[in-house]
């Protein structure tokens, strides 16, 4: 079940769902807006001839931070990693989805490529996969509204929430935009 603004407030007030820093003005009818942090990971396209999800390519991206109040410029066709300013923490019976803001989508900004799901039990900054599909550069200001979290109550608490030993939870506690760690549990079925 998708949580309403009332339900979201109840969960925040009870300390079960946490967003730090929390701003009550970000609450929407069935979501809560989140803001863009000031750190970005840009791809070093000259490091490898291709991206290999089975290999450790930790140096595929480098961290960039705009100076002062300057925006980060996302060029047409460019893809970078960003993250939410807020740290989100979920209990074992609530999951979340990261969605973009309609106003930004109308400018050609995509907030996530495929990783819009946040598992119950997760705690950390949420990494955003930012892409510019417009024909002009887009200015991304640290602290601007960048997306929204929608929360869903599970039919029962997760037996093994994110962060438990069973799944490895490679991104638990992540700070800032975190590069892919797909190689740590790469699986390929012989076909």
Curated annotation (Swiss-Prot):
The record marks 116-117 as: Important for bifunctional activity. Pathway: Pyrimidine metabolism; dUMP biosynthesis; dUMP from dCTP: step 1/1. It is an enzyme of class 3 (hydrolase). Signal peptide: none annotated. Its EC number is 3.5.4.30. Residues 171-191 have a biased composition (Polar residues). Keywords: Hydrolase, Nucleotide metabolism, Nucleotide-binding. Gene3D superfamilies: 2.70.40.10. One of its GO terms (biological process) is dUTP biosynthetic process. GO terms for molecular function: dCTP deaminase (dUMP-forming) activity; dCTP deaminase activity; nucleotide binding. DCTP binds at residues 101-106, 119, 127-129, 148, 162, 174. It catalyses: dCTP + 2 H2O = dUMP + NH4(+) + diphosphate. Bifunctional enzyme that catalyzes both the deamination of dCTP to dUTP and the hydrolysis of dUTP to dUMP without releasing the toxic dUTP intermediate. Homotrimer. This is dCTP deaminase, dUMP-forming. It comes from Nocardioides sp. (strain ATCC BAA-499 / JS614).
């Amino acid at each position: 079940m998708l949580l309403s603004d009332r339900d979201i407030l109840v969960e925040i007030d009870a300390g079960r769902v946490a967003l730090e820093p929390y701003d009550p003005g970000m609450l929407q009818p069935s979501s809560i807006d989140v803001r863009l942090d000031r750190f970005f990971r840009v791809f070093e396209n000259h490091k490898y001839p291709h991206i290999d999800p089975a290999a450790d390519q930790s140096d595929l991206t480098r961290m960039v931070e705009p100076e002062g109040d300057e925006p980060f410029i996302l060029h047409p066709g460019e893809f970078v990693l960003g993250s939410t300013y807020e740290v989100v923490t979920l209990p074992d019976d609530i999951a979340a989805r990261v969605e973009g803001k309609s106003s930004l989508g109308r400018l050609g900004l995509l907030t996530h490529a495929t990783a819009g799901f946040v598992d119950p039990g997760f705690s950390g900054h949420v990494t955003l996969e930012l892409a510019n599909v417009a024909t002009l550069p887009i200015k991304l200001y640290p602290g601007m509204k960048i997306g929204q979290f929608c929360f869903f109550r599970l039919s029962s608490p997760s037996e093994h929430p994110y962060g438990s030993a069973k799944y490895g939870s490679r991104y638990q506690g992540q700070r800032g935009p975190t590069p892919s760690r797909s190689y740590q549990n790469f699986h390929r079925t012989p076909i």
